[in-house]
Curated annotation (Swiss-Prot):
Keywords: Methylation, Ribonucleoprotein, Ribosomal protein, RNA-binding, rRNA-binding, tRNA-binding. Residues 124-137 have a biased composition (Low complexity). GO terms for molecular function: rRNA binding; structural constituent of ribosome; tRNA binding. This is Small ribosomal subunit protein uS12. It comes from Phocaeicola vulgatus (strain ATCC 8482 / DSM 1447 / JCM 5826 / CCUG 4940 / NBRC 14291 / NCTC 11154) (Bacteroides vulgatus). Residues 105-137 are annotated as: Disordered. CDD domains: Ribosomal_S12 (cd03368).
Length: 137
């Protein structure tokens, strides 16, 4: 516990809040160009081939960003919209690409949680396609 005189001399140090997505420069999203599109493996104990893109943002910073959903149409020089949000089992991936905007297509055949994957609403007359792996053998 400091004395009053010590506080007068030095004062309390203010804690600075650190951003979890510093490359966005306090913006909700940023536009960018894909520099490299590749797959990588997650940390233990998970196993998969996660789709990731290296993106150069409009503020000339480069970030690794995750491509959510099944399948994508991204390649080098694709224009994408990047938002914050890390992927827990991929070290160094602190951003997500927004599906269904700019050059990024929405996830095809998606019927639930469509807004998160940029999928359009299916036509009312069409029967829902059977879900993968749920059919009878």
């Amino acid at each position: 516990m400091p004395t009053i005189q010590q506080l007068v001399r030095k004062g309390r140090e203010v804690l600075v809040e650190k951003s979890k997505s510093p490359a966005l420069d306090s913006c909700p999203q940023r536009r960018g160009v894909c520099v490299r599109v590749y797959t990588t493996t997650p940390k233990k104990p998970n196993s998969a081939m996660r789709k990731v893109a290296r993106v150069r943002l409009t503020n000339s910073k480069e970030v690794n960003s995750y491509i959510p959903g099944e399948g994508h149409n991204l390649q080098e020089h694709s224009i994408v919209l990047v938002r914050g949000g890390r992927v827990k089992d991929l070290p160094g991936v602190r951003y997500h690409i927004v599906r269904g905007t700019l050059d990024t297509a929405g996830v095809a055949g998606r019927t639930q949680r469509r807004s998160k994957y940029g999928a359009k609403r299916p036509k009312a007359g069409q029967a829902a396609a059977p879900a993968k792996g749920k059919g009878k053998k």
